[in-house]
Regions:
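Short loop/turn segments that flank or connect secondary-structure elements
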Residues: 1-169
Length: 169
């Protein structure tokens, strides 16, 4: 498994190849088969190799973390504050999406000094679902997957394995 600190460097090195791989998949891959490969590789990394995202935390340090209304309610309740106080203290509007709130600070306000999530049991749905490699319709999300590859070792490893599966060298 690639070192999380080297993921961006390696992804940048392969950016041109990965762009061509995305085009190759769009033209040649069966969407259902590609999803099956994604799901199998996802399961291998997380279950067979027992990968723990909490030891990386690149996503917590670098991404805009979106908060849905149900996430706001859960985290505010856990912290013992009102939703309005939570919004005022921790969130800002996302300039890219109308009516969406994101955590205002990077790294995420809820990481402790050891990089562990202080709200893990109540973490936002966007955090629960990341890296989305076990979701359907991966072919139609390849652009964002490749963007996330810069920071996520799991996505990096899956893309590298997919290149082998599709004989894209």
């Amino acid at each position: 498994m690639i070192d999380p600190d080297k993921t961006k460097e390696m992804a940048d090195r392969f950016a041109g190849i990965n762009g061509r791989f995305r085009i190759f998949l769009k033209k040649n891959a069966d969407p259902k088969e590609l999803d099956e490969h994604f799901h199998r590789l996802h399961n291998e990394i997380f279950y067979k190799y027992d990968y723990d995202c909490c030891k990386c935390n690149n996503c917590c340090n670098l991404y805009d973390i979106r908060m849905e209304p149900k996430d706001i309610a859960a985290v505010a309740g856990h912290l013992g504050i009102t939703e309005n106080d939570f919004i005022e203290k921790y969130l800002i509007p996302d300039k890219r999406e109308f009516d969406c709130l994101i955590i205002k600070d990077k790294p995420c306000n809820f990481l402790d000094s050891n990089g562990k999530c202080r709200i893990y049991e109540y973490r936002p749905s966007v955090c629960r679902g990341f890296p989305y490699t076990n979701k359907p319709d991966r072919l139609y999300n390849m652009l964002s997957i490749l963007d996330f590859m810069e920071e996520c070792p799991v996505i990096f490893e899956i893309i590298e394995e997919l290149k082998k599966i599709y004989n894209f060298v």
